[in-house]
């Protein structure tokens, strides 16, 4: 994923959120409903990291697990998930199924 696509994904979460929940899905099968966001913030990624495409993340909270993942690769801490370069979802939708963003391979 290039930096432009990564930032687009972050801004879709940040810009869309108007109080309506969003559904986020990961490749491990985890599917959650999120009711709030922290906004975009700087993270600890460094330019020398092999998978560096940016130093920004977004936190989603008030997380309700709709489907459990098949591993623990996505951490839910204090009812929140940090979406960052090491934790990129596969798909983001509205509750009605309208796709807001989908990962390109």
Regions found by a protein language model. Give the residues of each.
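Conserved RNA-binding domains used in RNP assembly and mRNA/RNA metabolism
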Residues: 2-21, 25-27, 31-105
């Amino acid at each position: 994923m290039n930096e432009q696509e990564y930032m687009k994904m972050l801004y879709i979460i940040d810009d869309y959120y108007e109080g309506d929940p969003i559904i986020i899905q990961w490749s491990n099968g985890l599917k959650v409903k999120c009711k709030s966001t922290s906004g975009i913030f700087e993270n600890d990624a460094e330019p020398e990291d092999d998978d560096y495409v940016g130093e920004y993340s977004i936190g989603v909270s008030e997380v309700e697990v709709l489907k459990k993942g098949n591993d623990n690769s996505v951490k839910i801490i204090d009812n929140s998930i940090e979406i960052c370069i090491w934790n990129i979802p596969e798909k983001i939708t509205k509750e009605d199924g309208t796709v807001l963003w989908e990962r390109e391979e």
